[in-house]
UniProtKB/Swiss-Prot annotation:
Binds 1 [4Fe-4S] cluster. Keywords: 4Fe-4S, DNA damage, DNA repair, DNA-binding, Glycosidase, Hydrolase, Iron, Iron-sulfur, Lyase, Metal-binding. Residues 108-127 form the HhH domain. [4Fe-4S] cluster binds at residues 187, 194, 197, 203. It comes from the Bacteria. It comes from Rickettsia conorii (strain ATCC VR-613 / Malish 7). This is Endonuclease III. The gene is nth. GO terms for molecular function: 4 iron, 4 sulfur cluster binding; class I DNA-(apurinic or apyrimidinic site) endonuclease activity; DNA binding; DNA N-glycosylase activity; metal ion binding.
Length: 210
């Protein structure tokens, strides 16, 4: 996709939503990290429902560790893969306390070494908490990028690298939020709402429908 078209797409996103935010609800750096881990193969809505009562009392690594793995499972059992997620979060809490003074590191390599943290989670944390121009590629971003012709790739990492190359630096702080929200509410998986899409005139998928 030509640079001027990419720029136009993000100009439209920016005009329609100047300051996009994650839809995950969190209280501090640690609770965002936990929420993003829980959001893997789950919806933000389901995560927010589960963490509302959890974070009301247990919002630090020390408190989650005190709650314990079985106690944590009781709060997050409505979320997919809750057994493995609980195990990872408890292990993560121990590492944060012992290695990072119970703080969330602001380094990609340090983050992806934490249990339950992959590229997407690390990039979300770096972007949302520390304002870094990262590109977190979830299922929505992967689908939208390929569908509209923004970035073609067979894996999230390939799409991530393509997007980082073609998106102007000035858009990168908000770019992954715009793409996620576009995929969640307009460019849906089964049936995209092309009629209300603000960027359809620049979209490969829409062009091929004609």
């Amino acid at each position: 996709m030509q640079a001027q078209i990419v720029n136009k797409i993000f100009e439209i996103f920016s005009k329609n939503n100047p300051n996009p935010k994650t839809e995950l609800i969190y209280k501090n750096d640690f609770t965002l990290l936990v929420a993003v881990i829980l959001s893997a193969q789950a919806t933000d809505i389901s995560v927010n429902l589960a963490t509302k009562s959890l974070f009301a009392t247990y919002d630090t690594p020390e408190k989650i560790l005190e709650l314990g793995e079985e106690g944590l499972k009781k709060y997050i059992k409505s979320i997919g893969l809750f057994n493995s997620k609980a195990k990872n979060i408890i292990a993560l809490c121990k590492i944060l306390i012992s290695n990072y003074q119970a703080s969330v590191p602001n380094d990609f390599k340090a983050l992806i070494k934490l249990p339950g943290v992959g590229r997407k989670t690390a990039n979300v944390v770096l972007n949302c908490l520390f304002g870094m121009p990262t590109m977190a590629v979830d299922t929505h971003v992967f689908r939208v990028a390929n569908r509209i012709g923004l970035a073609k790739g067979d894996t999230p990492e390939i799409v991530e690298n393509e997007l980082l190359q073609i998106i102007d630096t000035k858009w990168l702080t908000h770019a992954h939020h715009w793409l996620i929200l576009h995929g969640r509410y307009i460019c849906k998986a089964r049936k995209p709402d092309c009629d209300i899409c603000p960027i359809k005139e620049y979209c490969d998928y829409y062009f091929n429908l004609k």
